[in-house]
């Protein structure tokens, strides 16, 4: 990889500032899912095993007013990290000042410290000042002064220019990617910049508007783009097909027409749909080919579409999947998503890359996650990367 990584650094005795993505679901101090904490462990362990002092920064949720702060403290995250590492972790309930500086000065080689939620800096004295999320230059400079080197392992925020990623990096002589960031750059960056062919993209989700940039960028690179999910029916409308009460972005129909004209046979739409009388798992539903009848809405791709998609995927060497094929959270309309997820697990000769919450949930539910090459930890970041955009968090990492 052309970027500096944590394994290129001399860490012994160094204060290693680490931007991690510990933005986990938390309610009443209880963590709902610790995947993001677990994902950062290899980099944290590497730093402390090589004699570094790990000083971890992360945001947690959005803070718009003082009352948001208590429920979004990093304390439970530090406790969970301590359990996962099986060693004490120092938690500092502030993001700046003497208490934090003294705690950092007191660290021994191999120690771990978690500072308070970086977004506490977004609200000061009741004012919404956005020092962290607005990349306040003084804040980035201050945080940079607390460490010797900077490791960015938070791909989930790589598409954002914040004080805790870009701000710190711009005040450091060396910024390296952590192992998680390195993996994202290698797999997603590799798929976008230098894929092995045939390269097939599977794009789902509700809105064409969310995926336009990705479709545009991948039309030039992919051999086929398979479309599923709610956005299918904006394309159907663009072809003059009937869509019943299905989801449609009427203001995007002309754009969908342009994409269809440009794509030719590269863009593959579903040929059948599972349709229901209303948006309800228990509503009467059936499978129809082509047009969606009046009084029905399409909520999943049908079995013929699944078979056609599998036929395209079976010879692929690179596959990128982002977005569900239907209303995955309702069992009667989850089949398309689950079938695609299951099939990807059988493609042992291909690089298989999955991103997006529902697609990731599907492969985890099916138990095939470990059979895939890479599951992306970034929602918006992986989408923008697939769009071919320069991500500020990655651009700020030093080149080798």
Swiss-Prot record:
List the subcellular locations.
Cytoplasm
The biological processes this protein is annotated with in GO are: gluconeogenesis; glycolytic process
Name recorded for this polypeptide: Phosphoglycerate kinase
Gene this chain is encoded by: pgk
Q: Which GO terms describe its cellular component?
A: cytosol
The molecular function terms of the Gene Ontology recorded here are:
ADP binding; ATP binding; phosphoglycerate kinase activity
Its lineage reads:
Bacteria, Bacillati, Bacillota, Bacilli, Lactobacillales
Give the enzyme's main class according to its UniProt record, as a single word: transferase
Return the CDD domains for the record.
Phosphoglycerate_kinase
Q: Which InterPro entries match?
A: Phosphoglycerate_kinase (IPR001576), Phosphoglycerate_kinase_CS (IPR015911), Phosphoglycerate_kinase_N (IPR015824), Phosphoglycerate_kinase_sf (IPR036043)
Its pathway, per UniProt, is: Carbohydrate degradation; glycolysis; pyruvate from D-glyceraldehyde 3-phosphate: step 2/5
Residue ranges annotated as transmembrane are none
Residue sites binding ATP per the record: 211, 329, 356-359
E.C. no: 2.7.2.3
């Amino acid at each position: 990889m052309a970027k500096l990584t944590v394994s290129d650094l001399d860490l012994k005795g160094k204060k290693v500032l680490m931007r991690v993505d510990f933005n986990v679901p938390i309610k009443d101090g209880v963590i709902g899912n610790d995947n993001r904490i677990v994902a950062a462990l290899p980099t944290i362990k590497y730093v402390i095993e090589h004699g570094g002092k790990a000083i971890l920064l992360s945001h947690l949720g959005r803070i718009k007013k003082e009352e948001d702060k208590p429920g979004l403290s990093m304390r439970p995250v530090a406790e969970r990290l301590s359990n996962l590492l099986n060693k004490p972790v120092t938690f500092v309930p502030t993001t700046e000042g003497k208490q934090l500086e003294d705690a950092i000065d007191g660290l021994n080689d191999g120690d771990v410290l978690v500072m308070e939620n970086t977004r506490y800096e977004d609200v000061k004295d009741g004012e919404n000042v956005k020092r962290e999320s607005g990349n306040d230059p003084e804040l980035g400079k201050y945080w940079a002064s607390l460490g010797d080197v900077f490791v960015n392992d938070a791909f989930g925020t790589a598409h954002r220019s914040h004080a805790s990623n870009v701000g710190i990096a711009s005040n450091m002589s060396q910024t390296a990617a952590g192992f998680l960031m390195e993996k994202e750059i290698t797999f997603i960056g590799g798929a976008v910049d230098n894929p092995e062919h045939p390269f097939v993209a599977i794009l789902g989700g509700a809105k064409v508007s969310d995926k336009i940039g990705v479709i545009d960028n991948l039309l030039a690179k992919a051999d086929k783009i398979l479309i599923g999910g709610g956005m299918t029916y904006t394309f159907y409308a663009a072809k003059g097909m009937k869509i019943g009460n299905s989801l449609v972005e009427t203001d995007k129909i002309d754009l969908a027409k342009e994409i269809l004209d440009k794509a030719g046979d590269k863009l593959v739409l579903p040929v059948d749909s599972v349709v229901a009388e209303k948006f309800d798992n228990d509503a009467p539903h059936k499978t129809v080919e082509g047009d969606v009848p009046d009084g029905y809405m399409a909520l999943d791709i049908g079995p013929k579409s699944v078979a056609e998609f599998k036929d395209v995927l079976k010879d692929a060497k690179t596959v990128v999947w982002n977005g569900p094929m239907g209303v995955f959270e309702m069992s009667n309309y989850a089949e398309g998503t689950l079938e695609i997820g299951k099939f990807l697990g059988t493609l042992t000769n291909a690089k298989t890359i999955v991103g997006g919450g529902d697609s990731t949930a599907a492969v985890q539910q099916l138990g095939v996650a470990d059979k895939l090459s890479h599951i992306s930890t970034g929602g918006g970041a992986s989408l923008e990367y697939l769009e071919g955009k320069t991500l500020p968090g990655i651009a700020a990492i030093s080149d080798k």
